[in-house]
Amino acid sequence: MPDNSSIANCCAASGLAARPSWPGSAEAEPPETPRAPWVAPMLSTVVIVTTAVDFVGNLLVILSVLRNRKLRNAGNLFVVNLALADLVVALYPYPLILVAILHDGWVLGEIHCKASAFVMGLSVIGSVFNITAIAINRYWCICHSATYHRACSQWHAPLYISLIWLLTLVALVPNFFVGSLEYDPRIYSCTFIQTASTQYTMAVVAIHFLLPIAVVSFCYLRIWILVLQARRKAKAERKLRLRPSDLRSFLTMFAVFVVFAICWAPLNCIGLAVAINPEAMALQIPEGLFVTSYFLAYFNSCLNAIVYGLLNQNFRREYKRILSALWSTGRCFHDASKCHLTEDLQGPVPPAAMATIPVQEGAL
């Protein structure tokens, strides 16, 4: 899936940046049209909220699976892997985007620019492949339960996860040969420039978005058909052995897929349209639409943990336990520090006062 800055380097018109370049360089050009004063505060708020929810939410997902034995299964290892893919952008690229917004330009140098763009791509493509793997896992678990445990045990899952990240790295390699990693001032982000090759951009959209969407849609469609058959016929239900936990897991991951598709579809549609007809489409796409589609895609990284909490009772229960434990620990530290502070303010009890305190008989 492309970070579609395929219109980032097009001619400056309709308020589009003429060419991403480093601040202070000889090639740097000011934007044709200044931004509205509310744009930077709004984008910074979106980035801060997304980063905070992403960090806390995905940590809760990981801790929930590690703590709860009911959640510690082969299927949820892919969920943890997806949470890690979402978490990594909250640790590196998003804070750098916030710095760029606050400085109204990139001030962290070329190395951080290229590295943040690479990490962003790693997270996005890793998420796509993880969601696809989860759909295949759910399909196999529900539709082919007889062979599921032989092929998808907890010992096999790490191999599949390693394969996912290997394919993710392979998918990122062509970007270093086809185009460069540069800063796009419209989205305050360093991203992959897709103008070098129309064919490459179309291939990226097809392989990283359309193909996974097709595979996931097929898997979930087959599951829906079998679920409906199981509800209508008691015999089919016995054959399928549909457990409530399997259905809950399926519905949760189906919701994750729908949210992902909604968040990333606008940006990929823009990239595909520009790839098909770059000269005509690049100038017709409003900058506001492009920026909105980009930040909608960024926002997706914090939504999965919310979906788990809303739709999966085991995750919701574990969230409450973790947050309650953290709250209790925080109160203990607060009460202890308050107690020590009171003792320090009152000072030691003088001997004369000690003498006036009656000692009860038998007291220790």
From Swiss-Prot:
Molecular function GO terms recorded: G protein-coupled receptor activity; melatonin receptor activity
Q: Which GO terms describe its biological process?
A: camera-type eye development; G protein-coupled receptor signaling pathway; glucose homeostasis; negative regulation of cGMP-mediated signaling; negative regulation of cytosolic calcium ion concentration; negative regulation of insulin secretion; negative regulation of neuron apoptotic process; negative regulation of transmission of nerve impulse
Ranges per topology, Extracellular: 29-45, 103-115, 180-200, 277-287
Q: List the disulfide bonds.
A: 113-190
The tissues where this chain's protein is expressed are given as: Expressed in the hippocampus, kidney, and ovary.
From which domain of life does this come? Eukaryota
Any transmembrane segments, and where?
46-66, 82-102, 116-136, 159-179, 201-221, 256-276, 288-308
**Cytoplasmic topology ranges:** 67-81, 137-158, 222-255, 309-364
Q: Secretion signal: which residues?
A: 1-28
- Role noted for this protein: High affinity receptor for melatonin. The activity of this receptor is mediated by pertussis toxin sensitive G proteins that inhibits adenylate cyclase activity.
Question: What family name appears in the similarity comment?
Answer: Belongs to the G-protein coupled receptor 1 family.
- Protein's UniProt name: Melatonin receptor type 1B
Q: Which gene encodes it?
A: Mtnr1b
